[in-house]
Amino acid sequence: MLGSRAVMLMLLLLLLPWTSQGRAVPEGSSPAWAQGQQLSQQLCTLAWTAHLPMGHVDLPREEGDDETTSEVPHIQCGDGCDPQGLRDNSQSCLQRIHQGLVFYEKLLGSDIFTGEPSLHPDGSVGQLHASLLGLRQLLQPEGHHWETEQTPSPSPSQPWQRLLLRLKILRSLQAFVAVAARVFAHGAATLSQ
């Protein structure tokens, strides 16, 4: 009986290096949960306070899965962003958040936002873009690259489409960063070393 326990212990010890090499955060470090919490809260605040020049507009709820909503990243149950998933292996969740940030970074840099002269780079959308970039860079340290799904570049939009597209993008970004902020708040409270 003692021999089988020793064999099991040796097998576990042999497996440890292999599991740690699959992490998205480099070996020997953990995500900067507190910094991620701060950046994600700032991003969340900016997403909710980004004012576009046309004032407040209520968008009707859309039914179905059209082309603009099918590509939008969502943090889902299988992404490991729940408390147990974060405790076991936070990398799946952090990679999903990173993918979403890349997606929204491309949208905020597209002609949907840059094609409007009244949206200055130092305005609220520019600040939102810079904050999003800061959080994305925190999740992907220099010299460390995650395999990401190919994020399609947005196709050029017509001027008449941009107002509605901006509103839809900001609405989905608000939902995405709200979940990401909760993930980082939980990580900062329970997983920081």
UniProtKB/Swiss-Prot annotation:
Gene Ontology MF terms in the entry: cytokine activity; interleukin-23 receptor binding
Tagged with keyword Disulfide bond: yes
Endpoints of the signal sequence: 1-22
Localization: Secreted
Biological process, per Gene Ontology: cell surface receptor signaling pathway via JAK-STAT; defense response to Gram-negative bacterium; defense response to virus; inflammatory response; innate immune response; negative regulation of interleukin-10 production; positive regulation of activated T cell proliferation; positive regulation of defense response to virus by host
Subunit structure and binding partners: Heterodimer with IL12B; disulfide-linked. The heterodimer is known as interleukin IL-23. Interacts with IL23R; this interaction enables recruitment of IL12RB1.
Family indicated by similarity: Belongs to the IL-6 superfamily.
Protein name: Interleukin-23 subunit alpha
Organism: Sus scrofa (Pig)
